[in-house]
Amino acid sequence: MSEKNAYAKSGVDVEAGYEVVERIKKHVARTERAGVMGALGGFGGMFDLSKTGVREPVLVSGTDGVGTKLMLAIKYDKHDTIGQDCVAMCVNDIIAAGAEPLYFLDYVATGKNNPVKFEEVVSGVAEGCVQAGAALIGGETAEMPGMYGEDDYDLAGFAVGVAEKSQLIDGSKVKEGDILLGLASSGIHSNGYSLVRRVFADYTGKELLPELEGKQLKDVLLEPTRIYVRAALPLIKEELINGIGHITGGGFIENVPRMFADDLAAEIDEDKVPVLPIFKALEKYGDIKHEEMFEIFNMGVGLMLAVSPENVNRVKELLDEPVYEIGRIIKKADDSVVIK
């Protein structure tokens, strides 16, 4: 008995792994950028930091997954956008620190290697990298029979970006009187899906709920997370932004205070928040308290910017999209976020 056959009998298909690598090469090639060294398949991905032209470089890293949104991708057998979610969760955190994403690595673990499915997954990762301007320089697909079911998989990513030391965004520049500008989310993004799945547990996904404006439920639930790099990076380069909040798990209540010092607070005008239809549907069909929605979801704002009043018009000018003036920074009295 050959070693290959013995391994196959244990549930690991080495040939399928090789096929995945061949299938994803064309997707990885789309993400090429200046600074990438070496080719896919080496023991480690390499990047030449000098190619960025940054004078005082500070590396900023982030890692994340997509939570139980993966379970809906598996349920609806749609795998070509979940990779973008994974990239977005990592690079949006990096941009919130003022850094430009440079490269990304992904990790997929599964019970049975399916080359067609995982090509779809990596195609989504590559699309996310293209949108973020990051190179996909490495990754791992681990076949783990017994750990996962044959149709199950998990997905995680790791991103590294660079910032000029003087342009780092760490909350120290945010001050009382700053204006809070919201950039629209594309949907639920990648948080709160344990609750989302409970609310819609008995739905097929093909439903046309009146709140969803003619879209099938499954398409709305799997709408990929928006990547904010192209929008935010020019603002960072012009040093127009005092603080950035990536609105992820914990919604407004948990994430907005991460933008500023402990003696400040955010006053949010709820009427100016562009609440998306899916959040109205979740509140209605899930019987969720209205105030709790802001503790869980992004409510239609995926990225929040703290901007000095004199810079607001310039920021709006640079952003080729609707910009929502949803609040301001105030002195903290009790709560770090006050929703009016």
Curated annotation (Swiss-Prot):
- What is the superkingdom listed in this entry's lineage? Bacteria
Q: Does the keyword Cytoplasm apply?
A: yes
Q: In which pathway does it act?
A: Purine metabolism; IMP biosynthesis via de novo pathway; 5-amino-1-(5-phospho-D-ribosyl)imidazole from N(2)-formyl-N(1)-(5-phospho-D-ribosyl)glycinamide: step 2/2
Q: Name one GO molecular function term.
A: ATP binding
One Pfam short name: AIRS_C
Listed A to Z, the keywords are: ATP-binding, Cytoplasm, Ligase, Nucleotide-binding, Purine biosynthesis
As its record notes, the protein acts as a catalyst of: 2-formamido-N(1)-(5-O-phospho-beta-D-ribosyl)acetamidine + ATP = 5-amino-1-(5-phospho-beta-D-ribosyl)imidazole + ADP + phosphate + H(+)
Its Enzyme Commission number(s) read: 6.3.3.1
Task: Name the Gene3D superfamilies for this protein.
Answer: PurM-like C-terminal domain, PurM-like, N-terminal domain
CC per GO annotation: cytosol
- Keyword Ligase listed: yes
Record's subcellular location? Cytoplasm
Predominant location category: cytoplasm
Q: What class of enzyme is it?
A: ligase
* GO biological process assignments: 'de novo' IMP biosynthetic process; adenine biosynthetic process
The record's annotation in InterPro entries points to: PurM-like_C_dom, PurM-like_C_sf, PurM-like_N, PurM-like_N_sf, PurM_cligase
Family membership noted in the UniProt record: Belongs to the AIR synthase family.
Against PANTHER family, the record matches this protein to:
TRIFUNCTIONAL PURINE BIOSYNTHETIC PROTEIN ADENOSINE-3 (PTHR10520:SF12), TRIFUNCTIONAL PURINE BIOSYNTHETIC PROTEIN ADENOSINE-3-RELATED (PTHR10520)
List the protein's name. Phosphoribosylformylglycinamidine cyclo-ligase
> Which species does the entry assign this protein to?
Streptococcus pyogenes serotype M28 (strain MGAS6180)
The gene is purM
